[in-house]
């Protein structure tokens, strides 16, 4: 090394001297020699370094590390596939086939181009399988009915309401012309919820970027929750899994479902058979009409889309009416149609033509009425529509007061009208209505004291809805009321009667200012005008007016179901010098109406009813005695309230010595007493048997046998016969048998697990697909179910549960099939007809329990779907009342029906069948050429071009789902909503947010439990 340095020094010196002293050519020669020398030196040094590498240490010093890396590399080439759904092997195999096809088509195609080994595909498949196993395990814990009804359906209801509001903002009160349907959809989406769409939905720019960004974030959060060892997984693998899920599953699925053509195709598929049936029915009706010469005229309504020929035929039918009552009914219906049309905004020429046709039809009906009645024709339609009565005239007519009372009930302000009518019943003469300045006998003072006391308790001291009466007036009345009956001051009596009259005038002013103007513009008032019930000879005499009010006053308690008011108004009217015989009819009417509200009171109308009627003895298999006792208690309370009202009427009838009225009231009193006595005896009988109906330590259960049954259009199934025996001192005293299917056992087990944690540890036979009813399998299941029931009988809290008692009760009859579309339409139409014209007789919204957690969302959805777009003040009934009606109509049968349908829809057999069809579809689709798919899509697209035909088919389909009560509103709303792709995507992404929130909530609860 030292010699080399000397050599370099000498060479460098010579080179410098050469540069300074020699010529150009010599310099070139020396420069070449120096380069050769420099190359030789560098080459020699590199060779020495290579020789030194042989003495360095190896980079894998530890053999254990080398072996670990080698094992990991070998394991990455292998994948251990565990069953995804071990409970049902058939379903697990189908899922395996789908995953295999998915990996082969979407993953291995590009992964083998990167690395010709299964390392990447195995890693992705492993993580996907872990996610599926976690999701499938959690699906079994989900109550699908609760999720759909309590979570998804409220979102759909809100979406429906916001869509209607946005559409009203875009369309407004006039016709708006859009050159393209997509333009209207964008405008509606922009106004939807004041422009607050989901973050993944963009109306401008590139929406795909926002969707991918949201789905990437959503998938990452979901994987962090459901994927085991998420934070220990390679970021590269997580990124690959996320992109695979987004681009191959989520994004195509969202785009496919949000496309309006997806729903259009479903409508076309579902309505095909319905259209064929409707065509056959239409031809049959046409043939029957040709054969019948006496069909009912006016059975069909005049419609907006009717042709000129149909309209002329309709007019011809009106001219053939031979019954004056039919003609008047038809005229009233036409007037209602016209009134409804006037309350809507006419957008085009069709509405104007429809209005003119209604006008012609009304005039034709009036001419027919004139001809049939033999009176000269005078067109009074303008008077009928424009006639507006004063509030005093309305209160002086019984029919008008009935309509006004219905209107006040809807506004929850009927107490004002009740109070006015009560005080009106106290008046005795026209000149001095309350007879305030006459010193009446002492009995009159006592009677007024009783009436005033009841009025104060019912209207002045009421906590729920007190009347807004000035304090000086109430103080004056209270002074008289607070006196002792033995020492009543006549001066205070006179002051109290004057104060009561002033309070009545004050209430009249309140109704005049707050309610009258709305009432005369409401549909109720119009219906009153159109029913030909306006008296042409209204007397201005107050006594005649008050007598008509008396007839109406008796009907009020049956509507409000307030016993206090019944006693007040009835007692007040008995003071009059000429009692009306309508009291007898009204009392009977009120009793019968209460019977309609309480089905257990029907025996009051039975003339053969006697107190000696046998009391029902509950059979041993009746385990629902507690519910029956509660129902009887409610009916007894209602009957006692009626009895108190009758007692008050009897006392007043005795004062006026009306023997006819007294006889009728006494008879009604006896009938109600008999009904109360019978129900009390029935209740006592059930109470004496209630203790004996307990299951714990008093009964034993066994499953003796099973039998194979078959229903129409369903495969064979097994029914297990359960024997329950009553024990007394170790001996069997009585027993009964019930038959249940396995799915009923499974539903019972599912409900009990949610309520009683101890049931979760019991052994229950799992679901499995039984291709054929093997007796060995059924016998094994029979023994397992018997052991399960016997375990339940050893748990006292489960034995007392309502679910188990209903399951084992012989009285647990399957709910009636209310969801046949024709039956539902018929029942609903009848209900609405009663509410529309006799609402006073049938329903009291204040007595409805609106806390139903299951039927409430469904009722709200139906109300939102079928409610008109008018202002809330002009609606036929408030939405709260609609919801209460639907909850009463459906009750628990709706929940049971939905759970049963979902259970039947997601049975293992059907899930297996759907998975198999899906797998075969994937395999068959992969075998086709893509060009054929494109040609097929191009050939199918024109089926959606004819929007009018599609809308008609949608109307037919939805009309079959909701028949009998003008489904046109629902048809149009649903169809318009489904055609907006942006809002469809908004709903889907909102549901994804709800899924993410539910997963986070479940993860937090799991972490707290652990």
UniProtKB/Swiss-Prot annotation:
Membrane topology summary: Single-pass membrane protein
Organism: Schizosaccharomyces pombe (strain 972 / ATCC 24843)
Top-level taxonomic group: Eukaryota
A single GO cellular-component term on record: endoplasmic reticulum-vacuole membrane contact site
SMART domains linked: PX, PXA, RGS
Keyword Hydrolase included in the entry's annotation: no
Protein name from the UniProt record: Sorting nexin-12
Record domain PXA: where: 88-274
Domain PX: from-to ranges: 698-815
RGS domain mapped to chain residues: 390-529
This protein's encoding gene: snx12
Gene Ontology molecular function: phosphatidylinositol binding
């Amino acid at each position: 090394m030292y010699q080399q340095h000397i050599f370099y020094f000498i060479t460098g010196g010579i080179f410098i001297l050469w540069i300074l002293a020699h010529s150009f050519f010599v310099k070139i020669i020396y420069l070449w020699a120096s380069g050769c020398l420099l190359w030789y030196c560098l080459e020699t040094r590199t060779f020495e370094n290579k020789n030194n590498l042989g003495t360095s240490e190896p980079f894998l010093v530890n053999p254990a590390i080398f072996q670990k890396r080698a094992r990991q590399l070998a394991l990455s080439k292998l994948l251990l596939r565990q069953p995804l759904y071990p409970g049902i092997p058939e379903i697990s195999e189908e899922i395996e086939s789908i995953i295999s096809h998915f990996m082969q088509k979407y993953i291995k195609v590009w992964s083998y181009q990167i690395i010709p080994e299964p390392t990447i595909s195995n890693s992705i498949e492993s993580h996907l399988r872990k996610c599926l196993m976690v999701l499938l395990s959690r699906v079994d814990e989900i109550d699908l009915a609760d999720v759909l009804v309590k979570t998804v359906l409220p979102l759909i209801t809100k979406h429906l309401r916001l869509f209607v509001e946005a559409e009203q903002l875009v369309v407004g009160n006039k016709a708006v012309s859009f050159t393209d349907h997509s333009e209207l959809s964008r405008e509606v989406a922009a106004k939807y919820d004041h422009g607050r769409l989901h973050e993944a939905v963009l109306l401008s720019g590139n929406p795909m970027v926002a969707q991918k960004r949201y789905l990437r974030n959503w998938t990452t959060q979901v994987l962090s929750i459901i994927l085991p060892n998420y934070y220990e997984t390679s970021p590269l693998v997580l990124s690959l899994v996320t992109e695979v899920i987004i681009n191959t599953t989520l994004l195509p699925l969202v785009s496919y479902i949000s496309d309006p053509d997806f729903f259009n195709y479903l409508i076309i598929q579902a309505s095909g058979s319905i259209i064929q049936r409707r065509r056959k029915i239409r031809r049959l009706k046409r043939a029957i009409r040709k054969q019948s010469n006496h069909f009912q005229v006016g059975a069909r309504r005049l419609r907006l889309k009717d042709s000129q020929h149909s309209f002329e035929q309709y007019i011809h039918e009106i001219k053939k009416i031979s019954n004056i009552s039919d003609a008047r009914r038809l005229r009233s219906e036409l007037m209602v149609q016209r009134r409804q049309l006037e309350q809507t905004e006419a957008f085009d020429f069709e509405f104007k033509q429809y209005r003119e046709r209604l006008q012609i039809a009304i005039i034709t009906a009036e001419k027919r009425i004139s001809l049939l009645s033999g009176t000269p024709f005078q067109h009074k339609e303008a008077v009928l529509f424009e006639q507006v009565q004063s509030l005093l005239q309305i209160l002086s007519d019984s029919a008008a007061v009935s309509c006004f009372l219905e209107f006040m009930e809807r506004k929850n302000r009927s107490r004002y009208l009740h109070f006015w009518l009560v005080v009106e019943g106290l008046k005795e003469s026209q000149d001095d209505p309350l007879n305030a300045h006459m010193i009446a006998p002492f009995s009159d003072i006592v009677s007024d004291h009783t009436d005033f006391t009841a009025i104060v308790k019912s209207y002045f001291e009421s906590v729920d809805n007190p009347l807004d009466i000035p304090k000086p007036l109430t103080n004056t009345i209270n002074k008289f009321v607070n006196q002792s009956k033995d020492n009543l001051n006549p001066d205070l009596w006179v002051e109290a009667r004057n104060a009561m009259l002033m309070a009545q005038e004050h209430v009249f002013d309140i109704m005049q200012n707050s309610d009258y103007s709305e009432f005369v513009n409401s549909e109720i008032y119009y219906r009153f005008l159109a029913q030909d019930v306006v008296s042409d000879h209204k007397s201005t005499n107050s006594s005649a007016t008050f007598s008509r009010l008396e007839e109406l006053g008796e009907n009020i308690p049956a509507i409000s179901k307030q016993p206090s008011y019944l006693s007040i108004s009835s007692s007040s009217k008995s003071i009059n010098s000429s009692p009306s015989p309508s009291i007898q009819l009204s009392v009977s009417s009120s009793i019968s109406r209460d019977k309609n509200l309480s089905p257990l009171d029907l025996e009051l109308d039975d003339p053969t009813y006697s107190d000696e009627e046998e009391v029902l003895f509950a059979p041993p298999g009746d385990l629902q005695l507690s519910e029956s006792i509660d129902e009887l208690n409610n009916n007894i309370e209602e009957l006692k309230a009626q009895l108190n009202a009758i007692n008050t009427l009897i006392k007043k009838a005795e004062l006026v010595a009306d023997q006819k009225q007294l006889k009728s009231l006494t008879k009604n009193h006896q009938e109600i007493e008999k009904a109360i006595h019978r129900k009390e005896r029935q209740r006592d009988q059930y109470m004496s048997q209630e203790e004996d109906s307990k299951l714990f330590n008093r009964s034993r259960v066994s499953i003796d046998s099973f039998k194979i049954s078959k229903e129409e259009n369903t495969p064979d199934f097994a029914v297990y016969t359960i024997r329950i025996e009553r024990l007394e001192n170790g001996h069997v005293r009585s027993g009964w048998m019930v038959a249940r299917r396995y799915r009923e056992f499974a539903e019972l087990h599912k409900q009990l697990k949610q309520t009683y944690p101890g049931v979760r540890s019991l052994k229950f036979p799992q679901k499995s697909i039984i291709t054929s009813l093997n007796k060995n399998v059924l016998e094994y299941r029979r023994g397992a179910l018997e052991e399960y029931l016997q375990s339940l009988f050893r748990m006292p809290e489960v034995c007392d549960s309502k679910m188990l008692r209903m399951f084992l009760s012989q009285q647990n009859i399957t709910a009636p099939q209310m969801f046949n579309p024709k039956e539902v339409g018929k029942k609903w139409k009848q209900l609405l007809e009663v509410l529309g014209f006799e609402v006073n007789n049938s329903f009291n919204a204040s007595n409805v329990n609106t806390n139903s957690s299951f039927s409430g969302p469904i009722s709200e959805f139906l109300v939102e779907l079928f409610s008109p777009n008018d202002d809330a003040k002009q609606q036929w009934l408030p939405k709260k009342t609609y919801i209460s009606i639907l909850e009463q109509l459906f009750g628990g049968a709706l929940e049971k029906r939905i759970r049963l349908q979902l259970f039947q829809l997601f049975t293992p057999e059907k899930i297996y069948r759907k998975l198999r069809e899906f797998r075969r579809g994937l395999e068959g689709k992969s075998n086709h050429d893509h060009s054929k798919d494109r040609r097929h899509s191009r050939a199918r697209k024109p089926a959606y071009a004819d929007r009018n035909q599609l809308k008609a088919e949608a109307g037919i389909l939805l009309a079959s789902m909701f028949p009998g009560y003008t489904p046109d509103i629902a048809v149009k709303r649903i169809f318009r909503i489904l055609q907006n792709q942006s809002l469809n995507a908004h709903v889907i992404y909102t549901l994804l947010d709800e899924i993410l929130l539910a997963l986070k909530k479940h993860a937090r609860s799991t972490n707290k439990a652990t």
